[in-house]
């Protein structure tokens, strides 16, 4: 089963993503801190898809994405940004770092499910 990790400092957002993914043929791990997810990745966890929030304390989504791109095991891992931000300059920064897609919160559950299905080719 493909492994999808969600990183968001909001427990509410994580609960919403859990509801969307419960019926999908994927394994899901959730983290409230990007640096914790990054530590697990560096310890050997290899996700098939990473979905992260942008605005988080300590390490934001773009910093997390940069760290993922600097890691040989995740430098090509598809990554989606799930955020309330809509600023074009932030989207451009993400695109420059190899971001796969941008989903705006509050998200439509079908949109998130479709994005996961498309990226993982389920």
Can you describe what each PLM-predicted range is?
Residues 30-49, 92:
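Acidic, metal-coordinating helix/loop segments flanking the phosphotransfer/catalytic sites
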């Amino acid at each position: 089963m493909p492994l999808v990790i969600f990183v968001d400092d909001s427990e509410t957002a994580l609960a919403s993503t859990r509801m969307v993914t419960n019926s999908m043929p994927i394994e899901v791990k959730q983290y409230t801190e990007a640096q914790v997810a990054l530590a697990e990745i560096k310890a050997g966890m290899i996700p098939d898809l990473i979905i992260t929030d942008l605005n988080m304390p300590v390490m934001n989504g773009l910093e997390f994405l940069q760290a993922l791109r600097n890691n040989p095991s995740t430098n090509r891992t598809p990554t989606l940004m799930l955020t309330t931000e809509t600023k074009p300059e932030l989207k451009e920064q993400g695109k420059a770092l190899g971001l796969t897609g941008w989903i705006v919160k509050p998200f439509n559950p079908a949109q998130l499910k479709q994005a996961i299905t498309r990226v993982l080719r389920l």
